Amino acid sequence: MALAGIGVDMLEIARMQQAIERRPHFIRRMFTDAERAYCERTARPAEHYAARFAAREAVLKALGTGFSSGIGFQDVSVERDQLGRPQARLAGKAAQIAAEQGVQEIALSISYTRDVAVANAVAVTNAVKPKVDQKEDAAQELARSFKEARSVLDEL
Protein backbone atom coordinates (compact mmCIF):
# COMPACT_ATOMS: atom_id res chain seq x y z
CA MET A 1 0.00 0.00 0.00
CA ALA A 2 1.12 3.54 -0.71
CA LEU A 3 0.23 6.82 0.91
CA ALA A 4 -1.88 9.14 -1.25
CA GLY A 5 -2.25 11.94 1.28
CA ILE A 6 -2.48 12.91 4.91
CA GLY A 7 -4.69 15.48 6.58
CA VAL A 8 -4.93 16.89 10.07
CA ASP A 9 -7.54 19.31 11.41
CA MET A 10 -8.59 20.62 14.78
CA LEU A 11 -11.54 22.66 15.99
CA GLU A 12 -12.36 24.40 19.24
CA ILE A 13 -15.43 22.74 20.72
CA ALA A 14 -16.74 26.12 21.94
CA ARG A 15 -16.88 27.32 18.31
CA MET A 16 -19.00 24.33 17.38
CA GLN A 17 -21.26 24.95 20.38
CA GLN A 18 -21.73 28.57 19.27
CA ALA A 19 -22.51 27.48 15.71
CA ILE A 20 -25.13 25.03 16.99
CA GLU A 21 -26.76 27.66 19.22
CA ARG A 22 -26.69 30.51 16.69
CA ARG A 23 -27.62 28.55 13.58
CA PRO A 24 -29.56 25.35 14.34
CA HIS A 25 -29.91 24.67 10.60
CA PHE A 26 -26.11 24.32 10.45
CA ILE A 27 -26.13 20.78 11.85
CA ARG A 28 -28.93 19.69 9.49
CA ARG A 29 -27.00 21.04 6.51
CA MET A 30 -23.56 19.78 7.58
CA PHE A 31 -24.21 16.36 9.16
CA THR A 32 -26.03 13.24 7.98
CA ASP A 33 -29.07 11.86 9.79
CA ALA A 34 -26.93 9.06 11.25
CA GLU A 35 -24.28 11.52 12.51
CA ARG A 36 -26.90 13.76 14.10
CA ALA A 37 -28.60 10.80 15.78
CA TYR A 38 -25.27 9.62 17.20
CA CYS A 39 -24.14 13.05 18.42
CA GLU A 40 -27.50 13.90 19.99
CA ARG A 41 -27.43 10.67 22.03
CA THR A 42 -24.22 11.74 23.77
CA ALA A 43 -23.86 13.80 26.95
CA ARG A 44 -21.92 16.55 25.14
CA PRO A 45 -23.07 16.69 21.51
CA ALA A 46 -20.85 19.66 20.59
CA GLU A 47 -17.72 17.54 21.25
CA HIS A 48 -18.88 14.89 18.82
CA TYR A 49 -20.04 17.36 16.19
CA ALA A 50 -16.68 19.16 16.43
CA ALA A 51 -14.80 15.86 16.10
CA ARG A 52 -16.81 14.92 13.01
CA PHE A 53 -16.31 18.34 11.45
CA ALA A 54 -12.55 18.10 12.05
CA ALA A 55 -12.61 14.60 10.56
CA ARG A 56 -14.31 15.90 7.39
CA GLU A 57 -11.65 18.57 7.01
CA ALA A 58 -8.84 16.07 7.63
CA VAL A 59 -10.26 13.65 5.04
CA LEU A 60 -10.57 16.40 2.44
CA LYS A 61 -7.00 17.51 3.13
CA ALA A 62 -5.84 13.91 2.68
CA LEU A 63 -7.60 13.92 -0.70
CA GLY A 64 -5.89 17.19 -1.59
CA THR A 65 -9.03 19.32 -1.72
CA GLY A 66 -11.40 21.17 0.57
CA PHE A 67 -15.09 21.86 0.29
CA SER A 68 -14.29 23.18 -3.15
CA SER A 69 -14.38 21.19 -6.37
CA GLY A 70 -18.13 20.64 -6.00
CA ILE A 71 -17.86 18.61 -2.81
CA GLY A 72 -21.03 18.80 -0.72
CA PHE A 73 -21.02 19.08 3.06
CA GLN A 74 -22.44 15.57 3.46
CA ASP A 75 -20.17 13.99 0.82
CA VAL A 76 -17.85 13.06 3.70
CA SER A 77 -19.40 11.62 6.84
CA VAL A 78 -18.16 9.74 9.87
CA GLU A 79 -19.66 6.50 11.09
CA ARG A 80 -18.47 3.98 13.64
CA ASP A 81 -17.65 0.37 12.87
CA GLN A 82 -18.72 -2.55 15.05
CA LEU A 83 -15.74 -1.92 17.37
CA GLY A 84 -16.55 1.79 17.72
CA ARG A 85 -13.71 3.00 15.48
CA PRO A 86 -14.42 6.02 13.28
CA GLN A 87 -14.82 5.29 9.58
CA ALA A 88 -14.92 7.89 6.81
CA ARG A 89 -17.79 7.40 4.37
CA LEU A 90 -17.46 9.11 1.00
CA ALA A 91 -20.27 9.97 -1.40
CA GLY A 92 -20.78 12.19 -4.42
CA LYS A 93 -17.83 14.26 -5.60
CA ALA A 94 -15.61 13.19 -2.66
CA ALA A 95 -16.03 9.53 -3.64
CA GLN A 96 -15.32 10.42 -7.27
CA ILE A 97 -12.08 12.25 -6.39
CA ALA A 98 -10.96 9.38 -4.16
CA ALA A 99 -11.64 6.87 -6.93
CA GLU A 100 -9.72 8.98 -9.47
CA GLN A 101 -6.74 8.97 -7.09
CA GLY A 102 -6.98 5.23 -6.53
CA VAL A 103 -7.75 5.63 -2.82
CA GLN A 104 -8.74 2.26 -1.38
CA GLU A 105 -8.99 3.21 2.27
CA ILE A 106 -8.97 6.25 4.51
CA ALA A 107 -7.55 5.59 7.96
CA LEU A 108 -9.17 8.00 10.41
CA SER A 109 -8.33 8.89 13.99
CA ILE A 110 -10.39 11.28 16.12
CA SER A 111 -9.70 12.60 19.59
CA TYR A 112 -10.78 15.48 21.75
CA THR A 113 -10.12 17.19 25.02
CA ARG A 114 -12.48 19.39 26.96
CA ASP A 115 -11.68 22.27 24.59
CA VAL A 116 -10.44 20.93 21.25
CA ALA A 117 -11.32 18.18 18.78
CA VAL A 118 -8.60 16.87 16.45
CA ALA A 119 -8.70 14.42 13.56
CA ASN A 120 -6.04 12.78 11.41
CA ALA A 121 -6.80 11.10 8.08
CA VAL A 122 -4.52 9.07 5.84
CA ALA A 123 -5.60 8.22 2.30
CA VAL A 124 -4.09 4.90 1.18
CA THR A 125 -3.85 3.45 -2.34
CA ASN A 126 -2.75 0.13 -3.78
CA ALA A 127 -0.28 1.91 -6.05
CA VAL A 128 3.20 0.60 -6.65
CA LYS A 129 5.63 1.82 -4.01
CA PRO A 130 7.43 5.02 -4.99
CA LYS A 131 11.09 5.16 -5.97
CA VAL A 132 13.59 5.51 -3.13
CA ASP A 133 14.10 9.27 -3.56
CA GLN A 134 10.33 9.84 -3.72
CA LYS A 135 9.85 7.60 -0.70
CA GLU A 136 12.20 9.76 1.35
CA ASP A 137 10.22 12.87 0.41
CA ALA A 138 6.94 11.23 1.44
CA ALA A 139 8.51 10.00 4.68
CA GLN A 140 9.85 13.47 5.44
CA GLU A 141 6.44 15.00 4.72
CA LEU A 142 4.73 12.49 7.00
CA ALA A 143 7.28 13.09 9.78
CA ARG A 144 6.79 16.85 9.49
CA SER A 145 3.01 16.46 9.65
CA PHE A 146 3.23 14.35 12.80
CA LYS A 147 5.68 16.83 14.38
CA GLU A 148 3.22 19.66 13.71
CA ALA A 149 0.35 17.67 15.21
CA ARG A 150 2.46 16.75 18.22
CA SER A 151 3.48 20.38 18.82
CA VAL A 152 -0.20 21.38 18.82
CA LEU A 153 -0.98 18.67 21.36
CA ASP A 154 2.01 19.69 23.50
CA GLU A 155 0.71 23.26 23.63
CA LEU A 156 -2.59 22.03 25.06
Question: Model-flagged regions — what are they?
Answer:
Residues 1-6, 10-156:
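Core catalytic alpha/beta fold that binds nucleotide/phospho-ligands
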